[in-house]
Regions:
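A structural signal for multi-pass alpha-helical bundles of membrane permease subunits
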Residues: 1-181
Length: 181
């Protein structure tokens, strides 16, 4: 009957709505956090760089199921995050409500994919022409002005690349949805 036909359409529209939400929420976070981390790592000592790069790539190299299970373990009713939040009087049953499960999927998506953006941006920062940065310094440019007028224009093709790759990947998210819901 009509009710049986409406159910698959409603499920499809709900999945489409969440996919669009996931895509448009995770993309800016991945770009901004990845770029800020790349800037930070670009300005630390060589010894610390290796550790930070290795540690930040960990979420990207583990399988999606293991990553989603880790998030599920941290946020389950008796997990670490609810335990810490209980000290502030906050009780959220993360796996019991649709909005909180969706939030966890979004958090997982940012955590899992951001290392890709970070490593692309870090590599891009290595190729920013030093003579352009030195010329800007001689001309009296501040750190912010060098970032805005020298570094960012050089990085824009990489920002577009990471954005397009993530937009394509965002429509293929299955494992975390299956594990976390």
């Amino acid at each position: 009957g009509p009710a049986a036909q409406a159910r698959p359409a409603n499920e499809f529209l709900g999945a489409l709505r969440f996919t669009l939400l996931y895509t448009f929420v995770t993309t800016p976070f991945i770009l901004v956090i990845g770029f800020l981390l790349a800037l930070a790592v670009n300005n630390v000592t060589q010894r610390l760089k290796g550790f930070v790069i290795s540690a930040s790539l960990l979420p990207f190299i583990i399988t999606p199921v293991v990553g989603a299970l880790s998030i599920k373990w941290l946020f389950r009713d008796n997990g670490l995050v609810p335990y810490i939040l209980s000290f502030a009087g906050i009780k959220v049953f993360w796996m019991a409500q649709a909005w909180s499960a969706q939030l966890l999927i979004i958090v997982y998506g940012i955590w899992h994919v951001m290392p890709f953006a970070f490593i692309v941006f870090y590599a891009g920062l290595q190729s920013v022409p030093q003579d352009s940065l030195e010329a800007a310094t001689i001309d009296g440019a501040s750190t912010w002005q060098k970032l805005r007028y020298v570094t960012l224009p050089h990085m824009m093709p990489l920002v577009l690349f990471v954005t397009l790759i993530h937009l394509m990947d965002a429509y293929r998210v299955f494992e975390p949805v299956m594990v976390l819901t």
